[in-house]
Amino acid sequence: MQLPPSTASSETHLEYTSHFQGAGEAWKDAEIITTEQRAAIQEVSALVQARADALRARLSASEQAAEATSRARARFGVRDVVLDLRVMACSDGLLNGPAQRSRSHELYRSVMLGRTASEITETRPRQQPELVQRMRTQLADAPDFAAKAPLLADLDEALQKSFGARGALDDAEAAENQASDAEIAARLELRRTLEQAYGKLRAAFPGQRDFVESFFPRRKARRSGEEGEAEKKRNEG
């Protein structure tokens, strides 16, 4: 019996179960099979089918979770761009207002936390919302000027959406990890079931190794040219 490598994908494992089920269906229709043997084939086929169905469900859930994470990551990326724009707008509002075009102005340095706007926007996306939140607090405590209220409103909206998008991404990544773990567990359970099925078939059909082996696909042997190429790559590595 040959099972796929333990590191093989769920899709590869399911290909093995498709072969197993195809062989089972063919043997059940074979005229040389007795009623008792047909019942044994039916039993192991049902076991394998149940585990295969479970893995398919877990695989589907894992793929959906990965897609959800990708969408959540894209949304958070968009919110990072928007937050950057709000930071730049705040910097411009200060420079065109009370800071009088000077980044060395005390108010500018206070609101911008002693940084330039670019230094803030270049912060890692996951860390930036807290930094901008501190900046927003400094702006709120600053003396009033014409652009202060709209700048605060824009920062508040951008921060709220950035925090929300980051939280949604965290939730999506956690769900993806959970789905991936469940898929791996289902795949391992399917491998164990295939091994058990092999043992049950050997017990039900003693001395008929070829018959039992027909339920499992055989890995194709490499042609000599392929083997030579593989050896060449190993030597080059």
Model-derived features with residue positions:
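Basic/polar low-complexity intrinsically disordered segments
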Residues: 1-237
